[in-house]
From Swiss-Prot:
It is an enzyme of class 2 (transferase). Catalyzes the 2-thiolation of uridine at the wobble position (U34) of tRNA, leading to the formation of s(2)U34. InterPro entries: MnmA-like, MnmA-like_C, MnmA-like_central, MnmA-like_central_sf, Rossmann-like_a/b/a_fold. Residues 150-152, 307-308 are annotated as: Interaction with tRNA. ATP binds at G13, L14, S15, G16, G17, V18, D19, S20, M39, G128. This is tRNA-specific 2-thiouridylase MnmA. Residues 99-101 are annotated as: Interaction with target base in tRNA. The active site is at C104, C200. It comes from Neisseria meningitidis serogroup B (strain ATCC BAA-335 / MC58).
């Protein structure tokens, strides 16, 4: 297990899922003083059919009872709405596709929760993320999780050094089947609970239905790059680059994909074929840079992920100014999407990254 300097008092973020449950059980088994915290980060729909917050809190309490630890329920809903959800809506309004889970980690789980835990006298917080941490010459390095199918370092790239120093990831060296086996061995009620999917505050509800509650929609044309109308979209914010499903374009030939959004004309630009050149990018510009180490990485060669679970892509990092950098890829990358995060790696070390603003293709048109 990766720890800080001999922490004794650890507060675990218990989400009601199997990963955080096993995290708490392992730490208790290893002799640490462990407490749990269930974070209530969403309130708007906590009585509707799609919201799992109540069940998740019941599961977290049941896990704490079996393990034999205390648990607090702490409400961060106001902070979440201000720091995460407002940004989520702002980005969709601008035609981009944000990743709120990245911001939730940086602003809620490793800021609000960390501040709360320190205020309660904790030395360290622990979460069920599949990531690792190593301390080398006093520097805390964020590394990919051993289970490459579950590695979540991509979602943690905005953590600062002071946050990493206070965090541990007990599952980082385990694979998911082993975590399930341990949950059954500990007789935890979450052992067979399915993993959560989608954005945390949306849950299993239809995305379009959810977003329409908060943002106005405006139907428009689906057009080819040559300007031919081939269909109608139901609102640009409901589509993301590279999307194939749900376009409703008939006819023969290869499948259609979203290639760009023209915000001025309210048009969705679509192309036929997965290998259409407009879907491929050789470079991107990212801003709002954030790095996990005390010094930002030097310009040079690294690998990058522009979306979760993609294979690392070799690239060249070039700084444009203090807050902006360009990445130039060795090979064209498919469906690089503004609003998503570009995350840099040096081998297994997660260095940080930024928010994708533009690419060498006109994917968000605002002229």
């Amino acid at each position: 297990m990766n720890t800080t300097a001999n922490p004794s008092n650890i507060i675990v973020g218990l989400s009601g899922g199997v990963d955080s449950s096993v995290t708490a059980a392992l730490l208790k088994q290893q002799g640490y003083q462990v407490r749990g915290v269930f974070m209530q980060n969403w309130e708007d729909d906590d009585n509707d059919e799609y919201c799992s917050i109540k069940q998740d809190s019941f599961d977290a309490i049941a896990v704490a009872d079996i393990i034999g630890i205390d648990i607090d329920i702490v409400n961060f809903a106001a902070q979440y709405k201000d720091k995460v959800f407002a940004y989520f809506l702002q980005e969709y309004s601008a035609g981009r596709t944000p990743n709120p889970d990245v911001l939730c980690n940086a602003e809620i789980k490793f800021k609000c929760f960390l501040d709360y835990a320190v205020g309660q006298g904790a030395d360290t917080i622990a979460t069920g993320h599949y990531a690792r941490k190593e301390v080398r010459n006093g520097v805390h390095y964020l590394l990919k999780g051993l289970d490459r199918n579950k590695d979540q370092s991509y979602f943690l790239y905005r953590l600062k050094p002071f946050q990493l120093e206070r965090a541990i990831f007990p599952l980082g060296g385990l694979e998911k089947p082993e975590v399930r086996r341990l949950a059954a061995e500990f007789k935890l009620p979450t052992a067979a609970k399915k993993d959560s999917t989608g954005i945390c505050f949306i849950g299993e509800r239809p995305f379009r239905e959810f977003l329409q509650k908060y943002l106005p929609t405006d139907n428009g044309k689906m057009v080819t790059p040559e300007g031919k109308t081939v269909g109608e979209h139901v609102g640009l914010m409901f589509y993301t680059l590279g999307q194939r499903k749900g376009l409703g374009i008939g006819g023969a030939g290869e499948p259609w994909f979203v290639a760009a959004k023209d915000l001025t004309k309210n048009e969705l630009i679509v192309v036929q074929g997965h290998d259409h050149p407009l879907l491929y990018t050789r470079s991107l510009v990212m801003n709002d840079l954030s790095f996990t180490l005390p010094e930002r990485p030097k310009a040079g060669r690294y690998t990058c992920k522009t979306r979760y679970r993609m294979a690392d892509a070799p690239c060249e990092l070039r700084y444009l100014d203090d807050e902006t950098a360009e990445l130039v890829f060795d090979e064209p990358q498919w469906a690089v999407t503004p609003g998503q995060s570009a995350v840099l790696y040096d081998g297994d070390i997660c260095l940080g990254g930024g928010i994708i603003q533009t690419t060498d293709k006109p994917v968000i048109i605002t002229r």
